């Protein structure tokens, strides 16, 4: 085992990386509320794992979406548990994100020189809400359908570009298969990719600048 470790150590300098991680200074004022961002990340990872598991059975069509969700809940081994954990962790992620934003704001963590960290955090908050909006529609039940119809109809109030925006979101003039396909693609590919990128940026900046001091 020692030879294997030495082989990797010689090439990757594992010990230096470990020392850098474990020796990072943590200010004495840090308390449990500073863990809210990490909890949000944990919820996101749970979302990725459970969401990926459900893609094996979910069918993103207006005729089969609801029945495929029913199949996951009633026929797939532990499917009910996977989907329930996905829903619970989604709610928890939104809650932890909101509390994290409040904590950062109230402790002044957005001030110089951490403005860019705050901006990436706000973008992540928008992405988190977008996850909720797109995921809510995927079962394609009555609640999901009408929620999509209302949400995608909001931009119509914008002068000049309102109607084109609505059509862009829906994929057509009315809510249908194109809308579900768009929301499924956003929920399972575009949003997770963007979230991973901005999370990496967010954590790298936190790592570089450290935790903000007390007010």
Curated annotation (Swiss-Prot):
Give the CC-aspect GO terms. Answer: chloroplast thylakoid membrane
Q: Membrane-crossing residues?
A: 32-52, 90-110, 116-136, 186-206
What cofactors does the UniProt entry give for this protein?
heme b; heme c
Q: Does the keyword Acetylation apply?
A: no
Query: What domain of life?
Result: Eukaryota
What membrane topology does the annotation report for this chain? Multi-pass membrane protein
The entry sums up its family as follows:
Belongs to the cytochrome b family. PetB subfamily.
What's the protein name? Answer: Cytochrome b6
Origin species, per record, is Psilotum nudum (Whisk fern)
**Gene that this sequence comes from:** petB
């Amino acid at each position: 085992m020692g030879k294997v470790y030495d082989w990797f150590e010689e090439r990757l300098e594992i010990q230096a990386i470990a020392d850098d991680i474990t020796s990072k200074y943590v200010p004495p004022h840090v308390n449990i509320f500073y863990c809210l961002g990490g909890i949000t990340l944990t919820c996101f990872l749970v979302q990725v794992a459970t969401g990926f598991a459900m893609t094996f059975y979910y069918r993103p069509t207006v005729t089969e979406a609801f029945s495929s969700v029913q199949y996951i809940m009633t026929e797939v081994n532990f499917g009910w548990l996977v989907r329930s954990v996905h829903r619970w962790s989604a709610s928890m992620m939104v809650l932890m994100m909101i509390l994290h934003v409040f904590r950062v704001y109230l402790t002044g963590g957005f001030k110089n020189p951490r403005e860019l960290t705050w901006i990436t955090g706000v973008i992540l908050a928008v992405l988190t809400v977008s996850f909720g909006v797109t995921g809510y529609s995927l079962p394609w039940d009555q609640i999901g359908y009408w929620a999509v119809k209302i949400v995608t109809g909001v931009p119509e109030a914008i002068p000049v570009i309102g109607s084109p925006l609505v059509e862009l979101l829906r994929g057509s003039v009315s809510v249908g298969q194109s809308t579900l396909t768009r929301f499924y693609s956003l929920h399972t590919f575009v949003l997770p990719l963007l979230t991973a990128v901005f999370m990496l940026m967010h954590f790298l900046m936190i790592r570089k600048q450290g935790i903000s001091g007390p007010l």
